[in-house]
Amino acid sequence: MKMLKIFLLFLLFWLQCSLWIGKNGILDYIKIYKKIIVQKKKNEDFQIRNNQLILEIERLNNAIKN
């Protein structure tokens, strides 16, 4: 019975390590999540810039036509 307890504790420890610091674990998830937030902000900034450029092009095209 004592060996079973030791084995189960070791198994629990190993699973927790895998969950937290293993490949695709929680720490990896947190890093990727932060990168996604930064990239979304960059994408929003680029979208605003693109919209401004589109408006400027349309304004210039209208100025040429008139």
From Swiss-Prot:
Extracellular-side positions: 22-66
Membrane topology qualifier: Single-pass type II membrane protein
Segments forming a coiled coil: 38-66
A Pfam family hit: DivIC
Cytoplasmic side of membrane: 1-3
Keyword Cytoplasm assigned: no
Record bears the keyword Membrane: yes
Biological process annotations from GO: FtsZ-dependent cytokinesis
Function: Essential cell division protein. May link together the upstream cell division proteins, which are predominantly cytoplasmic, with the downstream cell division proteins, which are predominantly extracellular.
Protein family (similarity comment): Belongs to the FtsB family.
Record's protein name: Cell division protein FtsB
Lineage: Bacteria, Pseudomonadati, Pseudomonadota, Gammaproteobacteria, Enterobacterales
